[in-house]
Amino acid sequence: KDIPWKIYPNHPDLSVEQEVAEYNACATNAFGEWRFEDVCLDFQPDIVVDIRDFWMMEFEQRSPFRRMFHWAIMPTVDAYPQNEQWLETFCKADSVFAYYEFGKSVLEKETGGQINTVGVASPSAASCYKQVANKTQHRNSMGIDPDSVIIGTVMRNQRRKLYPDLFKSFRQILEKTQKTNLFLYCHTSYPDIGWDIPRLLTENGI
């Protein structure tokens, strides 16, 4: 479709062997490292905004064009202490946003106030993110039993995520309650670099 802005695809052309080899040469190329300098040269951005984890964005700080753009980041900070290398990189950003007050306070405390935190991102005001007025009607419209109980999780399929424990625990809940209206909803990606989800589901009889 026609869009009013430039788009720079990151995935290699699978018909070009050299391009595929270059892409596969470094794991962080999946996050755009191999394209970043070319995009900077072509687009010449004044501001680069990145809302991802440290390892998905740190190459931007090492760019030879770093002094040419304002670097605004919003890293995931959900625990402490933070890795010192991460903190050093975050401190080099021109402006840093946090997801919530906890992350902001961790960054400020662990960097001794050397980081330029500019605020906490507000939750979306879009109507689609508001709680539905009638859950029964909403579930019926989606073809879901209104009496069902849905347990949900949102996380990438990575080895550090405890998917095996999650599925094992859900199986235990099913056996303990003997309820047939319990559902586990995983908002995730597959395949990814993590667990073999179909195998885990089969092993746990889910």
Regions found by a protein language model. Name each.
Residues D145-K161, F167, L184-C186:
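Conserved donor-binding/catalytic core segment of Leloir-type glycosyltransferases
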Residues F170-L174, L201:
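A conserved amphipathic alpha-helix that caps or lines the catalytic cleft of carbohydrate-
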Residues P64-R66, G194-I206:
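Nucleotide-activated donor-binding/catalytic signature segment of Leloir-type glycosyltransferases, i.e.
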Residues Q131-I150, L174-K179:
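Nucleotide-sugar donor-binding and catalytic loop/hinge architecture
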Residues R66-H70, A93-D94, G113-N116, T180-L182:
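A short helix->loop->beta-strand "cap" motif at the edges of active sites that frequently abuts
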Residues M74, Y99, A121, T153-N157, ...:
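Short hydrophobic "strand-cap" motifs at the C-terminus of beta-strands
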Residues K92-N134:
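Donor nucleotide-sugar binding/catalytic pocket of nucleotide-sugar-dependent glycosyltransferases
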Residues I3-K92, E101-F102:
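Extended catalytic core of nucleotide-activated donor transferases of GT-like folds
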